[in-house]
């Protein structure tokens, strides 16, 4: 009888051990790793926390928000065993299909240091990552449209990457963090009051950003690059001493001018001046210039058989621009204007044989001429003629043949913008008999 009883008890114990092992086998199969805990995180969202501290959320739709009891986050609390799993979560992976992160969901998860956000998340809820002090950086994908109130306040964030698609950054979203730099992505609709903390001192407002509310960036002596020319900036949006860089005449420029004198500074964004040589050539094709300042040194283009007439605002006509002209607010092109080199035909020179084998040539001045050429020969056809250049209107020819008749012509030349000579027509020949 005792033997039967022992066998019966052994069988019961074996069955009980198998029953106890079922949950462990199930969780291993579900996660691929040993599982610490499985959580119901939304109506259709499940969270599995493995032994490495990685919490993987899968499912569809929104997650639950969390109730906070003092420092305890009840979403991650196992009241049956009195275990606060919030302190065991090191990494969060939010799968595709999940559309929002609930309010206060990860509050006080003080060991959390990595968050991967799925491609379907549209909203990051209020206070969702508050006091996640080990979370140093996060990349928020462009599918996220709204970062709600206080979402990352008092977290350890040092860097955040925001993408085009984000619409709203609500009050306190990044307040009391260690962020120092931030770029507000293109077409963001609204950056609310106190969205960022006093450590953020390098700010870029991208094109298409619509509204920056009062005290959105309270840091003093910050530097803001405003690429959105028409952004609405509310009074006191930035801390005292902040420099705003933007297009001259833009909303940023007006904002600084409307504020108390000296409270902010404005730095005009340099514009680009393009030089169009207009059938000529120019070594300098563009330069950077500051609106409201002088153009300063301008390049000098060149063109064969033309002189440079200056830079103008239009290809034909327009206003002339010189070194001391003031630069406008927008990128623009200046066009070279040209004057064709025209040299008048020289008049017949006066030629006299003043001594043996010599002749003096007197040239009637041609307006604007840089110099002259004298051509002389013993044949009327000028075959075998010699040519002499001069910048004077009187020149003596030497080494001529005595008793010979010479034909003498002159022509003027000017120099074009390349420095080369452009000649006029030869004059009528003057004859002279040499002594």
Predicted regions and their residues:
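Structural signature of tandem-repeat unit edges
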Residues: 8, 52-60, 86-100, 110-123, ...
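Extracellular low-complexity, O-glycosylation-prone stalks/linkers
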Residues: 368-387
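Beta-strand-rich modules
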Residues: 397-419
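Secondary-structure capping and domain/repeat boundary segments
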Residues: 58-59, 268-340
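Sec-dependent signal peptide cleavage junction
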Residues: 19-33
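Pro/Thr/Ser/Gly-rich low-complexity, intrinsically disordered linker/stalk tracts
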Residues: 340-368, 402, 420-435
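Consensus positions within tandem repeat domains that build extended binding/scaffold surfaces
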Residues: 103-105, 125-128, 148-151, 170-173, ...
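Short S/T/G- and acidic-enriched coil/turn segments that sit immediately N-terminal to beta-strands
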Residues: 391-395
């Amino acid at each position: 009888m005792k033997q039967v009883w022992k066998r019966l008890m052994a069988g019961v114990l074996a069955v009980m051990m198998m029953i106890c092992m079922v949950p462990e086998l199930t969780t291993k199969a579900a996660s691929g790793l040993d599982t610490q805990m499985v959580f119901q995180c939304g109506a259709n969202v499940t969270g599995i926390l493995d032994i490495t501290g990685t919490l993987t959320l899968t499912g569809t739709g929104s997650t639950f928000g969390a109730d906070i009891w003092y420092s305890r986050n009840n979403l991650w609390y196992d009241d049956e065993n009195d275990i606060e799993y919030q302190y065991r979560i090191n990494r969060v992976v939010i799968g595709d299909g999940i559309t929002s992160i609930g309010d206060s969901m990860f509050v006080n998860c003080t060991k959390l240091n990595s968050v991967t956000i799925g491609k379907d998340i549209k909203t990051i809820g209020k206070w969702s990552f508050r006091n996640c002090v080990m979370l140093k950086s996060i990349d928020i994908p462009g599918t996220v449209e709204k970062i709600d109130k206080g979402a990352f306040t008092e977290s350890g964030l040092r860097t955040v990457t925001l993408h085009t698609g984000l619409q709203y950054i609500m009050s306190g979203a990044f307040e009391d963090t260690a962020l120092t730099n931030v770029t507000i992505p293109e077409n963001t609709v609204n950056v609310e009051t106190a969205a960022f903390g006093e450590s953020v001192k390098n700010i870029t407002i991208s094109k298409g950003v619509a509204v920056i509310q009062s005290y959105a960036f309270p840091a003093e002596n910050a530097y803001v690059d405003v690429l959105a020319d028409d952004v609405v900036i509310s009074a006191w949006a930035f801390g005292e001493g902040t420099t705003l860089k933007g297009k001259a005449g833009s909303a940023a420029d007006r904002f600084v001018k409307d504020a108390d004198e000296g409270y902010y500074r404005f730095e005009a964004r340099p514009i680009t001046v393009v030089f169009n040589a207009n059938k000529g050539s120019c070594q300098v094709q563009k330069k950077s210039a500051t609106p409201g300042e002088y153009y300063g040194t301008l390049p000098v283009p060149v063109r064969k058989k033309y002189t440079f007439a200056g830079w103008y605002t239009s290809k034909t006509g327009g206003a002339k621009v010189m070194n001391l002209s003031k630069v406008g607010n927008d990128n623009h092109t200046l066009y070279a204007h040209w004057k064709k080199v025209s040299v008048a035909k020289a008049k017949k020179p006066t030629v006299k044989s003043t001594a043996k084998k010599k002749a003096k040539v007197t040239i009637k001045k041609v307006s604007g001429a840089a110099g002259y050429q004298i051509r002389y020969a013993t044949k009327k056809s000028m075959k075998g003629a010699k040519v002499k250049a001069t910048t004077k209107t009187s020149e003596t020819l030497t080494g001529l043949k005595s008793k010979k008749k010479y034909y003498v012509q002159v022509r003027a030349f000017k120099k074009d913008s390349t420095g080369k000579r452009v000649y006029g027509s030869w004059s009528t020949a003057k004859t002279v008999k040499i002594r």
